[in-house]
Amino acid sequence: MAQDPPKLEPEVHKPPPSDAPLPQLAVPAERRPNRKTNGKGVQTEETRICVVMVGLPARGKSLIASKVVRYLGWLSIPAKTFNVGQYRRTNTPTPTADFFDTSNAEGERLRKAAAEAAVNDMIQWFDDGQGIIAILDATNSTKARRRWIQNRCEAAGIETMFVESKCDDEDLIMSNIKEVKTTSPDYKGQDPELAAQDFRNRIRHYEKVYETMDEDEADLTYCKLIDVGHQVIINRLKDYLQSRVVYYLMNLHIKPRAIWLSRHGESNFNLEGKIGGDADISERGELYARKLPELVRESAGDMQLTVWTSTLKRTIQTARFLPFEKLSWKALDELDSGVCDGLTYGEIEAQYPADFKARDEDKYNYRYLGGESYRDVVIRLEPIIMELERSENILIVTHQAVLRCIYAYFMGSSQQQSPWMEVPLHTLIKLTPRAYGTVEERWYAKIPAVSTWRGKGSSAKHQEMQTPEPEGSHEVRTPELVGKGNKDGMLGVKEGLGLGLTVEGEAKV
């Protein structure tokens, strides 16, 4: 007598294993206990931390701030950047360098007012219960300004941790100046060379009054990053979350670089509509594997990359023609679908209808019986993210769910949307992190493949891709277009896909 299949019990909000190193805070408000914890038994009910950036212009402060916020959000820790420059631009949108001269009384008044407004909004943000960690992004270049911030935060019951980026590497400073003159809102629409000269003059004004953090501020909590992490000085860390931020900072570098992402070539399981497994690539997947080196040359030129794959055959087969060093990571293996491994979505819906529905309702937290959730994948990917931040130019060939999680980290995409992103086969993605956003580019192999994207409630078998052919083989998305389209980048959620793209120089929304 045939036995009924085992019941697949959803574990929608089950926390990760007890040895997981990350705080778990993304629990719906109605299910939160009176005493909040961060998943490690550390009380966070009253935890409010202001990370105060310190340093001269062109030292990567805004890039560091944006990375920290993205990292914390990726780990379900609510965080927000309060950029004093944005407040200042309300009254002075395009100031010249003279505005930052300390002898300019009106400029000094407006800059102090901007700092006041940013700190006030930050305190209100904490009081409204919207987050746990705020980043105050500004030069905060004098001891007097830092002490003022410390006193304001202390009066509001907010811990402070100062993060100073101190850099004397002229090549890196010039690289940052080059980026600022082309991406900073202060110089939008201006001649790049005139913008660079004005920005250098601004730096000189700050250099006149700049005071690095030293023993005079030994009572403060701070992390001092010298020459892009070549030396790190840590003083008076107080709690777990501060140590998590410092751990991340110690793995950062702010040198210009890019990350390339690609799924494996189409697999035989893709053709059959099955999930998981360790299938070989199909004939069309083999064509993509042979085409991939050409796409990489188009996007990277003569640059030497390191290729990371999972340990599964389809990624190793896809990467085998690439003329670079290759490393296989178990952490890059596809999301483990447990007892559903090797099934189609139609079979999962037929055998486990309640569980099929439960996963659609909370795809990020739902864990397959004997398998993983997207949250679990994020946890095992943290070492990968740290290695990516320490490395320079990496090409990752891996799987749909894993790429969704990595892409969400770099683009700051929400947990609600990242599991529903469409990551097409036979496409190379290049991400270039910058201070004011991540530039995304795509190269299309134009080799047919099935679409493995599934909408909520759908159990349809994988079909040939129905997405329109791009006008060219190359698309670019710049940070300025984020406000016009989907903030989650090109890998949009299909429901209400609103992309702002630049296709071969032609803007499209």
Could you tell me what each predicted segment is?
Residues 2-7, 11-13, 21, 40, ...:
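NTP-dependent small-molecule kinase module
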Residues 17-37:
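N-terminal pre-Walker A segment at the start of P-loop NTPase domains
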Residues 24-25, 37-42, 214, 231-258, ...:
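Acidic, low-complexity terminal tails and accessory targeting/binding regions
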Residues 33-44, 124:
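Pre-Walker A adenine-sensing motif
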Residues 53, 396:
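Hydrophobic anchor at the beta1->P-loop junction of P-loop NTPases
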Residues 62-123, 130, 169-173:
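Conserved substrate/cofactor phosphate-moiety recognition/catalytic segment
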Residues 97-109, 152-212:
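A glycine- and Lys/Arg-enriched "phosphate-lid" helix/loop adjacent to the NTP-binding pocket
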Residues 138, 143-147, 152, 157-183, ...:
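Phosphate-coordination/substrate-recognition cap region in phosphate-metabolizing enzymes
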